[in-house]
Amino acid sequence: MDLTNYIASIKDYPKAGITFRDISPLMADGKAYSYAIREIAQYACDKDIDMVVGPEARGFIIGCPVAVELGIGFAPVRKPGKLPRDVVSADYEKEYGLDTLTMHADAIKPGQRVLIVDDLLATGGTVKATIEMIEKLGGIVAGCAFLIELKGLNGRHAIRNYDYKVLMQFPG
């Protein structure tokens, strides 16, 4: 199945010069959405994954069904102030400055094998911060999976030492 047929490209959104890749049409089509989830779960099935981790918000949309498909748990990565218990955090660089991500300090146990799932690999900042938190907690990043990679933004560099899968590529 060619999943690129289920991605809407919106030019000049959210600002001039940017083409936003909208996954809403993919999610609206049950067959395409299921296919994408199964493809990521298939990638993970031989990696002895203990936990799926996904950054808000679209990492939840993709990561939770992958976790269900694998029969394992899901741990959310959130912006500061959104999680009610003790957290670990990591800063990452965005095009307009620093930002921070957090996850519960008890979300990953030492030695657990983790799959990071998100909708988009762009610059790699989000996944790099997520990896930092998982490893700070003693987890092992067994793989990363993304629906889309924006090729020109060099996000692969951030995960060059990790196994990963990308379902679709678009220009950055």
From Swiss-Prot:
Its EC number is 2.4.2.7. Pfam families: Pribosyltran (PF00156). Gene3D superfamilies: 3.40.50.2020. Pathway: Purine metabolism; AMP biosynthesis via salvage pathway; AMP from adenine: step 1/1. One of its GO terms (cellular component) is cytoplasm. It comes from the Bacteria. InterPro entries: Ade_phspho_trans, PRibTrfase_dom, PRTase-like, UPRTase/APRTase. Keywords: Cytoplasm, Glycosyltransferase, Purine salvage, Transferase. GO terms for molecular function: adenine binding; adenine phosphoribosyltransferase activity; AMP binding. CDD domains: PRTases_typeI. It catalyses: AMP + diphosphate = 5-phospho-alpha-D-ribose 1-diphosphate + adenine. One of its GO terms (biological process) is adenine salvage. It is found in: Cytoplasm. Belongs to the purine/pyrimidine phosphoribosyltransferase family. Homodimer. PANTHER family: ADENINE PHOSPHORIBOSYLTRANSFERASE (PTHR32315:SF3). Catalyzes a salvage reaction resulting in the formation of AMP, that is energically less costly than de novo synthesis. This is Adenine phosphoribosyltransferase. The lineage of its organism: Bacteria, Bacillati, Bacillota, Bacilli, Lactobacillales.
